[in-house]
Each structure stands twice: as structure tokens, then as C-alpha cells.
Design a protein with these regions (language model features):
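Surface/interface-facing alpha-helical segments and adjacent flexible terminal/loop regions used
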Residues: 1-60, 66-133
């Protein structure tokens, strides 16, 4: 009985060392040895991560704006306001660093609003929330 041998690459067992190696190869112009397949995978992952972060922060921002505007719980106002300021700042930083993500922000706004609206209506059913932004 023969065992199938699986070739384990640097990428598979030490991601940080793999990154350092690829960066070094790119800087030195050693493009022949760059692990292109995994580099593309990592770059796609980064792009997706940034979009997910924008959507996540947008949902948190919308949630806390809705709660602050429509939920009559004065003891919670300060915490909601702090979260609103923090999320606005973080979103501004992300969009300043990657202006192309503004399109994703705009495109995902309605979906994020609808998602959050369901949650706040469920959590605070005694308060009326608007159907649209």
C-alpha cells in the first residue's frame, strides 16, 4: 500500500515566514520564485476583509444611530454616542486609506440598514423605527 505524499509548502506551515519570503522576492525582482497562486489568494482575502470591515462598521454605526434617535433610554445615550463617534472615525480612516471602498459603502448601505433594522426592531419592539433611512 502506498501513501500519497502531500507536498507541504512554506505557505502551508508558516504564513509569516512565507509573507517575509514573498516580500523579499518581490523587492529583489525575483519574480520567477514568487508563489503567485497563494499570493493571489492572500490579496483576494485582503480585499474581501476590507469590504467586510466596512460593512461591519457601517452596521454598527447604523444600529447605534437608530437606537440613539428612537430608543428612549437616556442612561444608554452616552455609550451609543461614543460608539457612533468611534465608528464614524474608523470608517473615515478606512475610506481615506482606500477611497475605492466608498463605492462598496454606498452599495452596501441599504442592505446593512435592512439587516440592522430587523435586529433593533426585535430587540426594542416597543419603539417605532423608520422603514427607510
Amino acid at each position: 500500500m502506498t501513501q500519497a505524499m502531500v507536498k507541504q509548502t512554506l505557505y502551508d506551515y508558516d504564513l509569516n515566514l512565507w509573507l517575509e519570503t514573498v516580500i523579499s522576492q518581490l523587492r529583489s525582482g525575483d519574480l520567477q520564485n514568487v508563489d503567485i497562486e497563494n499570493l493571489i489568494e492572500e490579496l483576494e482575502g485582503l480585499a474581501g476583509r476590507d469590504k467586510r470591515e466596512v460593512a461591519s462598521r457601517l452596521k454598527t454605526l447604523i444600529e447605534h444611530i437608530l437606537k440613539r434617535c428612537y430608543v428612549d433610554m437616556p442612561n444608554e445615550f452616552r455609550g451609543w454616542e461614543v460608539t457612533i463617534r468611534t465608528q464614524r472615525f474608523e470608517l473615515e480612516q478606512i475610506l481615506e486609506q482606500s477611497p475605492s471602498l466608498k463605492r462598496h459603502f454606498v452599495e452596501s448601505f441599504d442592505k446593512c440598514f435592512k439587516f440592522v433594522l430587523e435586529d433593533v426592531r426585535s430587540d426594542y419592539s416597543q419603539y417605532p423605527f423608520p422603514d427607510t433611512w
